[in-house]
Amino acid sequence: MTYHHLSVLVHRQAEKYGDKIALKYRDYETAQWIPISWKEFSQTVRRTANAMVALGIEPQENIGIFSQNKPECLFTDFGAFANRAVTIPLYATSSPAQAQYIINDAQIRYLFVGEQFQYDAAFSVFGFCQSLQQLIIFDRAVVKDPRDMTSIYFDEFMAMDEELQHNAIVEERTAAASDDDLANILYTSGTTGEPKGVMLHHFNYREAFRIHDIRLPFMTDQDVSMNFLPLTHVFEKAWTYLCIHRGVQVCINLRPQDIQTTIKEIRPTLMCSVPRFWEKVYAGVQEKISQETGLRKAMMLDAIKVGRTHNIDYLRQGKTPPMMLHLKYKFYEKTIYALLKKTIGIENGNFFPTAGAAVPDEICEFVHSVGINMVVGYGLTESTATVSCFLNEGYEIGSVGTVMPDVEVKIGENNEILLRGKTITTGYYKKPEATAAAIDRNGWFHTGDAGYLKDSHLYLTERIKDLFKTSNGKYISPQALETKLAIDRYIDQIAVIADERKFVSALIVPVYGFVKDYAKEKGIAYSNMDELLQHPKIQALFRARIDTLQQQFAHYEQVKRFTLLTEPFSMERGELTNTLKLKRSVVAKNYKELIDKMYEE
């Protein structure tokens, strides 16, 4: 396998693949997917790189990209790399204050923005960002503020050097590009404290490509990947770079909420996702089964049982299934499994990397039982994504797979997972104290995650900082309980409360549609959502479902009381990070009255 520096990667692939499709994006006016060939991708990156020189961008300068997923994000990335510049992605959902912090911390002069929301947020803090000189707007539909005298649209930016007059400078910079150059600074939104900029160098990505080539030999240039998670997230960013390195076609999903439509239009072979995606699939299947009766219901249940035995008890362990079991499995593969996959849009599936949170055992078993190759993994921004992931055979349900080649893992004090290797960050941008606290003198990066190794498989137990201590001195892992309860089809979001409290309670955001359906079925009258959620029958429904799911936990770990919320946790109120992780301190503050009420005698 040949490894190219990111500054030339797209051009080398264009030489190899020419008119083959490299990227696709959805035109929302025509509802058509527009293809971009490798040749066009390369030409656009070259034009972007030249326009950057015309704009005045210098080597190792920090460039901001504040946008939802768009092809322009990749043009900007690779145009910057050709100039030895550094790209800093901001989450499309970032608030003006979050954008202001990153712009000032990284001293960004040029910020590329996506749509109206990002433009408005960036322009509103322009005066508070001394380094900021100009916004470059991807979407022509954005309406500029009447006071804005400096911003330009991306097509105007590209027109700054249509003749490639600065190509000699670009070529000179590219020739000087090194693996030791900084590639990205990825700001972790952080559930506590201010964001930290994780520095990822070109050598981090080169090593990530190498170890994934060893681990994922079945990924080919015939694959089609759906780009679903934000390109700001290291999981999707590193994955998309890997796809480009492997010649995989990347289909860019602009709006996360449209994934159920776009996945059916593209029918990809690959897609990075988070456990919540599969939890919704599982909940949908359970709902369908609960509505069926007689033979159809029996067949659906049998199909899952047969799949579990065939794929998990036999194939997973490298054993050959008995002939009758195999024939039964093949029947269901052509009927029930095929229908399920087609309904989701993944009947062409090769494999589906899944990470970002714990995958409940029930979900993992179900997905593999119906013949979907979900590759569960574990990684961090600081490790250029993957630390460990499933193998096709020999994976262990409940684990996060086996450690990637040449990544060193050690279990330290408090069972903390420590990492060392060429994919690990050199530290946090302009934060020497935070870097020294995270990377010890022997080069071990301290993840803050607790876990253990067993037979070469890595298991996560909890986030060390998230451990709660009850007023009775018992330690509770809220994430373990939340992961278990969140698989219930009636539960959308959950926050476990226990710190310095005498027992465990929970704030629960229900799936409102399912609750309304249940009320209709049971003849429950109500005038508003608050009244419905307080109804004794609804309270009893949730009590029973919670008690069933939490049986495996010790008595002191179980939810004793809960409150059903009438609206979801939100990023706007600061309750969720940009990666939708709970900010527990904010939740505790925002819902203090409701929480205190649960502990009244």
Predicted regions and their residues:
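Conserved ATP-binding/catalytic segment of the ANL
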Residues: V403-T470, A498
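Conserved AMP-binding A3 loop
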Residues: P35-K39, A183-F209
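Structural core segment of the AMP-binding/adenylate-forming
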Residues: L9-V10, A82-M160, L541, D547
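Conserved AMP-binding/adenylation subdomain of ANL enzymes
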Residues: R206-V224, L231-Y337, N348
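ANL superfamily adenylate-forming
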Residues: D27-T30, F117-S178, V285-L339
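Conserved structural elements of the adenylate-forming
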Residues: S42-R47, D179, V198-F218, A338
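Conserved pre-ATP/AMP-binding loop-to-beta segment of ANL
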Residues: G18-I21, I137, E162-Y187, E194, ...
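Conserved AMP-binding/adenylate-forming core of the ANL superfamily
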Residues: L23-P71, F75-F78, S95-Q100, Y153-A159, ...
